C-alpha cells in the first residue's frame, strides 16, 4: 500500500526523516518494501528566472538568459517552447544535471548557439496536472512568481516528498489506509493523532422516499447509506488531487474523488448510486439469482449465481457488493441526486466472488482482508464532511444504518502484567506497558486485585487474548530488549536419529527406490478441497480446525487428509506439462476431538501416495505398499470398500493384523472430469492415490525387524487358474491360500481373464504359488497334498473352481 510522507504529516507532527521513520516502522512490524523519493533521478535542477529573451533567427528556438541565483545570474539556455514570457520562473536543468529516466543534460550547441542547460516542462520532471498545476501544458512549466532563483526545484513543485510502499499483513486490515498507518506512526513517535474532520450538518429534507433493505445480513453485517441532493459536479481542490496522485489515482470529478479519497484515507470502500438510474428508488442487498447479469463500471459483463452478493434496485443488480459498481447506476455529468453507501461485507464472499469472476479492485482488496463494523460509520461521516466542505451537494436528513443485530462493543481482555511479561520472557515496567497500550488506543483499567481489564479499539479485531497484548507491547517497546538465551528446558544430546525418525527415513528411502519423489505441501487448505473430493457433509474429515487469522481463505483450515493436497500437486504438474510421475508425502494431519477445540488436536502422521501418467495403474501403488510391508516385515490384506474419491471398482482398503490402515485406488471418474486440466489430459491420464495412517502402520511393527536365513532348499512352484464370481476379491483368494497350508511362502496374481466361455458374472484369476520348508526339501507328494487342501478350502469358502 502506498502512503505519502506528506499526507502522514497532516495527522501526526513528525519530527524525524522519512528514512528514520522507515526504520521505526520496520522495528514495529511493518515492512516498508520500498521508500520512493519523488525527486528520484533529478539533480541540479533549480528555479530559473528568465531575464532576457531573443528569438533565434531561422529557427524555432528562443535564446534565453536565465537567473539561477548562486549557480549564475546570466546563464544562456535555448528552448523550443513558446509559452513563456520575460520574468517567468521556470525549471532550469543546468549543465551536468540529470532528469528522470537517466537523462543527462550537458552544455551543447543548438542551431549553432551555445546552450548551457535545458528549460523543463512538468512532464520532463515526472509531474502531472494533479501533482502540480500546469505540468501537462505544452511547453515549459511556469512556476509561481514568488519562486526564488537558484532554489532547488523539488520543494517548489512538491517533489520533496516520499512514498512509503508498505506491505500490510493479513492480521492488520486496520492499516489498509493512510489514517491506519498514521495511528501507528503517532504511537511510535509518542505524538498525538490529529483525526480528519468528520462533522457535517443535514441542510434539507429528501424530495422523495427511498427504500433500503438487507436480505443477506450474514454477508452484510452493516449497511449505511445517506441521501444527498442537488449534486454539483466540478473539479476537486488541488490538495485532494495531489493526495490521489501520490497514491496512483487520477482525479475525475469532485464527487468521484471524494469516494476514492475516503477509501485511501479511511480504508473504507464506498460507492455512490445515481438515484435517477435506480429503479423504484430501492436498494436491496441480496444474493444474486442464478443467471443474473451485470455490467460493471469497467464495461465487463458477468453472469452471477447465488454465491455472489449484489446490490440491486427494484429490477436488477446495480453493483457487485464489495467489488465494483454497475455501469447502469454510475454517476455522470447529469447526476443530481446520489445515495452514498458504506458497508461491511463478509470477506469470504467478496474473495470468492472476486476470484470466480476474475474481477479485482481496491475495494475488494480491502474487504478480502477485512473491514470492521465501525469503519462504515467513520467513512460515511468523512465523505459527507467533504461533500459539505467542497460544496458538492446538499445533505438531506435521510440516512440508513442496517445491522445484523450484533452490538458494536470493544473486546475486553482480563490479564495481568506477569502474564504479558511471561510471554515476552523479559520484565517490562507496568507503567511502560500501560503507556504503550494507551498510545495504541487501548484502555487499561487496573483492578483492585492487580489484574488489568484491557479493552481493544473497535478497529483491532485481530486482538483476542493476552499474547496479542504482549505482541503489541514488545513491538513498541523494542525487540532489541529481548536478550537471546538458551531454553531452560533444552537438553543436551549427542545427536542422531531416534527410532521413529529412523523408521520414517527407512520408509522414505524405500519409496524413493520405487521411483517416488517426495512432495511437501502446506498444512492448511480450504473446505473447497473436501468438495473437490466429493466428501459427504457428515464425513469425519470435514470436521476441520478453522484458523482464526488465515493468510487467505484458501488456507483457512488445518488439513485432515493429505489426498487433496496430493491431488492439487498432481494437477499442477499436469498443467505445467509434466505428464507422468510418482509422488509421496509423509506429514501430519490435524484431528480435533471436538469442535470448537478445547485441547491440543491429535497430530497423526500420515502417508500419501500419488501416481499419474498413461502407464501407471492400480498395481503401481499396490506394489509400493507391498514393498513397504516387506520392508517392515508385515503382511497387508486388501478388502473392497467404497471411498467417495476413489473408483468403486478400482480401489481397496488396506488392513494389517485386522487393523485398517487406509485406502488406495484410481481417482473417481466424476472427480477426474472436474479437474481443471485439458480434456485430452483427462482422457489419457490415470491418476492413482493412496492414503495410510502411518502411526497405525508402525503400531503393527514388532520392534526391530529380524531377518531369517535363506532356505538352502529350492521352493516348489505351482500355478493355479481359478474360476470365481466377479465379486470375489483377489485379496480374499490370496488370504485363503496362505491359511490353507504352512508351506505357502508366496502367492502372486499373474493373470485375470474374462470371457463368454466362463459364464456370466464369472472371471478367471491365475496365481503363482511358492511352497517351501526351511528344514527340508518339499516333496512332490507334499506339494500335491498342499495344493489339494488349498483347492478344497477355496471351493468351500469362496466357491472357486479349478479352471
Regions found by a protein language model. Give the residues of each.
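Glycine/proline-enriched, intrinsically flexible loops and inter-domain linkers
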Residues: 5, 23, 53-55, 189, ...
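Conserved mixed alpha/beta core segments that line enzyme active sites in large multi-domain catalysts
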Residues: 33, 47-77, 242, 246, ...
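Mobile "lid/hinge" segments at catalytic clefts and subdomain interfaces of large enzymes
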Residues: 114-130, 135-140, 154, 162, ...
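Terminal amphipathic helices with adjacent charged low-complexity linkers/tails
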Residues: 185, 189-214, 391-420
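Extended, well-folded interaction surfaces typified by the phenylalanyl-tRNA synthetase beta subunit core
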Residues: 413-579, 718, 770-774, 782-803
Amino acid at each position: 500500500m502506498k502512503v505519502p510522507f506528506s499526507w502522514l504529516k497532516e495527522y501526526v507532527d513528525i519530527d524525524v526523516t522519512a528514512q528514520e521513520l522507515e526504520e521505526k516502522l520496520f522495528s514495529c512490524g511493518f515492512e516498508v518494501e520500498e521508500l520512493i523519493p519523488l525527486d528520484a533521478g533529478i539533480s541540479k535542477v533549480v528555479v530559473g528566472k528568465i531575464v532576457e529573451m531573443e528569438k533565434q533567427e531561422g529557427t524555432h528556438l528562443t535564446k534565453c538568459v536565465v537567473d539561477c541565483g548562486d549557480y549564475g545570474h546570466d546563464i544562456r539556455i535555448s528552448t523550443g517552447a513558446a509559452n513563456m514570457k520575460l520574468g517567468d520562473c521556470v525549471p532550469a536543468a543546468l549543465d551536468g544535471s540529470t532528469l528522470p529516466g537517466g537523462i543527462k543534460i550537458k552544455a551543447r550547441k543548438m542551431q549553432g548557439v551555445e546552450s548551457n542547460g535545458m528549460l523543463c516542462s512538468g512532464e520532463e520532471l515526472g509531474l502531472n496536472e494533479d501533482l502540480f498545476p500546469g505540468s501537462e501544458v505544452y511547453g515549459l512549466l511556469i512556476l509561481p512568481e514568488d519562486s526564488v532563483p537558484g532554489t532547488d526545484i523539488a520543494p517548489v513543485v512538491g517533489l520533496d516528498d516520499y512514498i512509503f510502499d508498505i506491505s500490510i499483513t493479513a492480521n492488520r486490515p486496520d492499516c489498509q489506509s493512510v489514517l491506519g498507518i498514521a495511528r501507528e506512526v503517532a504511537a511510535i513517535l509518542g505524538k498525538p493523532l490529529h483525526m480528519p474532520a468528520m462533522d457535517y450538518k443535514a441542510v434539507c429534507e429528501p424530495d422523495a422516499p427511498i427504500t433500503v433493505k438487507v436480505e443477506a445480513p450474514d454477508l452484510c453485517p452493516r449497511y449505511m447509506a445517506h441521501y444527498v441532493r442537488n449534486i454539483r459536479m466540478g473539479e476537486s481542490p488541488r490538495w485532494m488531487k495531489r493526495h490521489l496522485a501520490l497514491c496512483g489515482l487520477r482525479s475525475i470529478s469532485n464527487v468521484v474523488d471524494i469516494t476514492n479519497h475516503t477509501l485511501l484515507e479511511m480504508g473504507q470502500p464506498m460507492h455512490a448510486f445515481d438515484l435517477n438510474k435506480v429503479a423504484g428508488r430501492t436498494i436491496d442487498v441480496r444474493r444474486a439469482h442464478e443467471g443474473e447479469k451485470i455490467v460493471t463500471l469497467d464495461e465487463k459483463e458477468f453472469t452471477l449465481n447465488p454465491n455472489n452478493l449484489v446490490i440491486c434496485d427494484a429490477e436488477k443488480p446495480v453493483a457487485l457488493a464489495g467489488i465494483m459498481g454497475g455501469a447502469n447506476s454510475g454517476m455522470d455529468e447529469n447526476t443530481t441526486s446520489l445515495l452514498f453507501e458504506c458497508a461491511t461485507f463478509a470477506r469470504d464472499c467478496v474473495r470468492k466472488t472476486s476470484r470466480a469472476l476474475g474481477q479485482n479492485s481496491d475495494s475488494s482488496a480491502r474487504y478480502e482482508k477485512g473491514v470492521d463494523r465501525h469503519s462504515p460509520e467513520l467513512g460515511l461521516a468523512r465523505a459527507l464532511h467533504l461533500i459539505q466542505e467542497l460544496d458538492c451537494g446538499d445533505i438531506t436528513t435521510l440516512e440508513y444504518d442496517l445491522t445484523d443485530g450484533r452490538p458494536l462493543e470493544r473486546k475486553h481482555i482480563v490479564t495481568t502484567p506477569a502474564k504479558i511479561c511471561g510471554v515476552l520472557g523479559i520484565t517490562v515496567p507496568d507503567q511502560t506497558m500501560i503507556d504503550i497500550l494507551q498510545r495504541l488506543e487501548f484502555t487499561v483499567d487496573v483492578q483492585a486485585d492487580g489484574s488489568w481489564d484491557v479493552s481493544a479499539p473497535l478497529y483491532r479485531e485481530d486482538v483476542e487474548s493476552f499474547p496479542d497484548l504482549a505482541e503489541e507491547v514488545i513491538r513498541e517497546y523494542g525487540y532489541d530488549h529481548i536478550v537471546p538465551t538458551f531454553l531452560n528446558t533444552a537438553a543436551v544430546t549427542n545427536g542422531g536419529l531416534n527410532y521413529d525418525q529412523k523408521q520414517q527415513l527407512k520408509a522414505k528411502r524405500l519409496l524413493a527406490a520405487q521411483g517416488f519423489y517426495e512432495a511437501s505441501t502446506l498444512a492448511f487448505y480450504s473446505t473447497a478441497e473436501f468438495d473437490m473430493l466429493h466428501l459427504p457433509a457428515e464425513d469425519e474429515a470435514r470436521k476441520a480446525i478453522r484458523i482464526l487469522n488465515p493468510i487467505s481463505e484458501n488456507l483457512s483450515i488445518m488439513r485432515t487428509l493429505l489426498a487433496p493436497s496430493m491431488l492439487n500437486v498432481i494437477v499442477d504438474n499436469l498443467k505445467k506439462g509434466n505428464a507422468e510421475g510418482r509422488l509421496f508425502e509423509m506429514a501430519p494431519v490435524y484431528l480435533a476431538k471436538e469442535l470448537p477445540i478445547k485441547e491440543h488436536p491429535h497430530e497423526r502422521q500420515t502417508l500419501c501416495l500419488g501416481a499419474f501418467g498413461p502407464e501407471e495403474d492400480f498395481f503401481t501403488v499396490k506394489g509400493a505398499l507391498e514393498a513397504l510391508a516387506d520392508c517392515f516385515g508385515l503382511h497387508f490384506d486388501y478388502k473392497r470398500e467404497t471411498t467417495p474419491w476413489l473408483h468403486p471398482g478400482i480401489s481397496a482398503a488396506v488392513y494389517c493384523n485386522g487393523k485398517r490402515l487406509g485406502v488406495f485406488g484410481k481417482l473417481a471418474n466424476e472427480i477426474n472430469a472436474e479437474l481443471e486440466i485439458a480434456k485430452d489430459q483427462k482422457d489419457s491420464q490415470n491418476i492413482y492415490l493412496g492414503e495410510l495412517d502411518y502411526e497405525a502402520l508402525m503400531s503393527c511393527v514388532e520392534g526391530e525387524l529380524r531377518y531369517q536365513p535363506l532356505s538352502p532348499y529350492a521352493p516348489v512352484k505351482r500355478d493355479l487358474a481359478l474360476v470365481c464370481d466377479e465379486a470375489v476379491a483377489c485379496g480374499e483368494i490370496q488370504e485363503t491360500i496362505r491359511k490353507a497350508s504352512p508351506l505357502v511362502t508366496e502367492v502372486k496374481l499373474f493373470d485375470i481373464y474374462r470371457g463368454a466361455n466362463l459364464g456370466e458374472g464369472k472371471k478367471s484369476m491365475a496365481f503363482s504359488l511358492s511352497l517351501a520348508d526351511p528344514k527340508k526339501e518339499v516333496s512332490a507328494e507334499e506339494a500335491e497334498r498342499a495344493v489339494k487342501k488349498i483347492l478344497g478350502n477355496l471351493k468351500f469358502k469362496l466357491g472357486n473352481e479349478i479352471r
